A protein has these predicted regions:
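Flexible, glycine-/basic-rich loop-and-beta segments that form/coincide
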Residues: 1-49
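C-terminal target-recognition/interaction regions appended to catalytic cores
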Residues: 48-184
Length: 184
C-alpha cells in the first residue's frame, strides 16, 4: 500500500496504464534473456546468475508446472509440512511462475526456489538476480554490483526485493509533480 498526502490539497494518482486485462507478463519482462542452468552465471551479464539447487530441489522443480506448487510433486518429494491432513502447509512456496501472467510480488529471497513462487516458468531453476530486477521494472542495464566488492545474492536480493518497483515510483513521482503543478 502506498499513501500519498498533502496538506495543500488532495493528490490524485495518474490514471493506471494497466488493468486485469492489460498487464506486463513474466514473458514480457524476462522472456528475452538467455537460458541459464541452476548455479550458472551468464558470461555477458554477471547479474544474470541463478542459485544452485540441491539435488532434491532439482527433482522437485522438474515436477513443478507453471502456476503450480509442491502439490504437483510425487509424495516422496514432499516435505513433512506439506503432508499435513489439515490441508494447510505453506501453499505459496516451491511455486513456478507462469509466462503469460503477471509476476508474483518479488521479495528479498526471490532467488531461492523454496521461498515463494519464484521458479522460472520453463527452466529448472529459481529466478536469476537479473530476472528479479527486471520484474521489479529496473532497466536491463542497471547494475547492483560494486566493482570493488563481490556482492552476494543475498545482498543484491535485499536491494531488489525491498525496492519500490521503478515504474511504481515513477507513477508516484509524476502524481506528486502534477499535484504541485496544479497548485500553481
Amino acid at each position: 500500500m502506498v499513501l500519498l498526502a498533502s496538506r495543500l490539497g488532495n493528490i490524485e494518482l495518474i490514471p493506471p496504464i494497466y488493468d486485469e486485462n492489460n498487464y506486463i507478463t513474466v514473458r514480457d519482462a524476462i522472456g528475452n534473456l538467455p537460458a541459464l542452468e541452476d548455479g550458472a552465471t551468464d558470461p555477458n551479464d554477471q547479474l544474470h546468475r541463478a542459485s544452485r539447487l540441491s539435488e532434491m530441489n532439482r527433482k522437485r522443480i522438474r515436477q513443478s508446472v507453471p502456476g503450480g506448487s509442491w502439490k504437483d510433486w510425487d509424495d516422496d518429494l514432499k516435505l513433512p509440512c506439506h503432508k499435513k491432513t489439515s490441508g494447510k502447509g505453506y501453499r505459496a512456496v516451491y511455486g513456478r511462475m507462469e509466462w503469460d501472467k503477471p509476476s508474483p510480488t518479488i521479495t528479498t529471497q526471490y532467488y531461492g526456489y523454496g521461498n515463494g513462487r519464484f521458479g522460472h516458468p520453463e527452466q529448472n531453476r529459481a529466478l536469476s538476480m537479473r530476472e528479479g530486477a527486471l520484474l521489479q521494472s529496473f532497466p536491463n542495464d542497471y547494475q547492483f554490483l560494486d566493482p570493488e566488492h563481490q556482492e552476494t545474492n543475498r545482498s543484491i536480493g535485499v536491494h531488489i526485493g525491498n525496492a519500490v518497483p521503478v515504474e511504481l515510483g515513477r507513477a508516484i513521482g509524476t502524481s506528486i509533480l502534477n499535484h504541485l503543478h496544479n497548485l500553481g
